[in-house]
Amino acid sequence: MSHFRVMIWLTLFCVGFGYCASAQSLSYNPPPEKTKVQSTGVWFGLYTKYHFNDKWAYYGEYHIRRRNGFKDMAQLYLRFGVTYTLAKYADLTVGIVNPYYWAPDQDDPNLDNVVPQFRTWEQLVFATPFDHIKLYHQLRFEQRYKRGYEKGSSFKLTHRFRYKITLYVPLNKPAFENHTLFLSFYQEIFIQAGESVIYNHLEDSRTYAGLGYNLSEQLQVQAGYMYSFRHFGAPHVYEHRSIFRLSLYHHLDFHLDKHREKRDIPIH
């Protein structure tokens, strides 16, 4: 009798184990293969910094960004801020941002063609002093109220942290002054957080190389190539962007004190 019970239990165990194994094999889905998406764009930017005295300045950025080369409108950025000079090599800025995003599919009736965002932001820029080259560090925090392109979608709060390190190397002069041609490099990392952020905490990585020229003490132009790497709509999809950037930097100082200390923080 005991042998009979043992046989029954072994049979039930084998049947149950086989059922579980079969169910697991049927429910298992292999992870999707990594997908790479290539895109191109052209970004234009105007950066302004207007000093009212030794400590306070207005800061502004105005960007027009196009996708698919130059073909389609992508974004319009309007960034405003107030800058306080902490020291010769350090600036603190706070302000607001009002960007607008154009939907990639402008013909989809279920999507809004243009969607706004609302942000507040804080930034610390400081320089590492060297004799000839210039090295800058930028720490930027953003609180973003953003929504999708779907009609009627609600705004959600996310947070973003950005760190950028920038290097300027003069080419035709020993130091930076009027009519200096220089190399410009930077690397910037974007990290985001929030309830709606699930897999793409590392939002973007941007690498830039270009040339710049100091037209005068108040005006500078830069042009170069930027490579961007980021998630694109799904955990296994990655977008590689090749972007041409053309930027104009305008600086004015309304403070008339001729004995003020020379500032070493550029427009960023």
Where are these regions (language model features)?
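Solvent-exposed loop/turn segments connecting transmembrane beta-strands
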Residues: 33-41, 66-75, 195-202, 233-240
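Residues that define the transmembrane beta-barrel architecture of outer-membrane proteins
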Residues: 38-42, 74-76, 116-120, 155-163, ...
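Residues on the lipid-exposed face of transmembrane beta-strands in outer-membrane beta-barrel proteins
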Residues: 46-50, 80-84, 122-128, 163-171, ...
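Short loop/turn motifs that connect adjacent beta-strands in outer-membrane beta-barrel proteins
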Residues: 54-55, 89, 129-135, 171-181, ...
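Transmembrane beta-strands of outer-membrane beta-barrel proteins
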Residues: 58-60, 92-94, 135-139, 161, ...
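Transmembrane beta-strands of outer-membrane beta-barrel pores
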Residues: 62-68, 96-102, 128-130, 141-145, ...
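Outer-membrane beta-barrel "beta-signal"
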Residues: 124, 240-268
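Outer-membrane beta-barrel transmembrane domain signature
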Residues: 140-222, 228-229
